[in-house]
C-alpha cells in the first residue's frame, strides 16, 4: 500500500515537471512570434480588448453584475488601449503601465468579493477571470520583450541613422522574458559548441 502511494507522488512530480516545461516552451514560442509580428500582435490585443469590453457589457446587461465591478473593468480596458498606443514599447515606469497594474489588483479584489457573496459554478467564475481579468495582461506580459528588436525610429540631433543603430541603439544584452527563457533552456538543455 505504501509503495503505490509513493509511486503516485512520484508520478505527480514528473507530470508537474512536464507540464511546466510544456508551458515554458509554449511561452517561449509565443514570445518569439510576438517579437516577429508586432503589428499583428497589436491588432490581436486590440481585438481582445474589444472582446473583453463586449463581455463586460454583456455581463452587466444579462447577468446584472455590479456596476462598480463592470465600471472598473471598462476603465481598465480604456487604460489598456492607452498602453496599446505605444506598443511594442511599454515603459514599466509610465503612469499608464503603473495604473494598469493597480487596476488589475482592484479588479481581482472586486471579483473575489463578488464571487464570495454570489454563487456561480467554478467554470463560470473561471470564464470571467479568463476573459475579463487575465487574457489581456497576459498578452502584454508576454509581449514585453517585443520592443527590443524593433529598428530604431528616433534619433538625437547630430546623429545619423547608421551610427545610432550600430553604437547607441545596439545593446550588448537582450532584456525581457526571452532572456529568462533562453537562460532556462541553456540550463536544462545546454547547446553543443563546435570545437575546431
Swiss-Prot record:
It is found in: Membrane. One of its GO terms (molecular function) is COPII receptor activity. Pfam families: Erv26. GO terms for biological process: endoplasmic reticulum to Golgi vesicle-mediated transport; positive regulation of apoptotic process. Keywords: Membrane, Transmembrane, Transmembrane helix. InterPro entries: Svp26/Tex261. GO terms for cellular component: COPII-coated ER to Golgi transport vesicle; endoplasmic reticulum membrane; Golgi membrane. The chain crosses the membrane at residues 3-23, 42-62, 70-90, 97-117, 125-145. It is a multi-pass membrane protein. The keyword Cytoplasm does not apply. Its main location: membrane. Belongs to the SVP26 family. This is Protein TEX261. It comes from Homo sapiens.
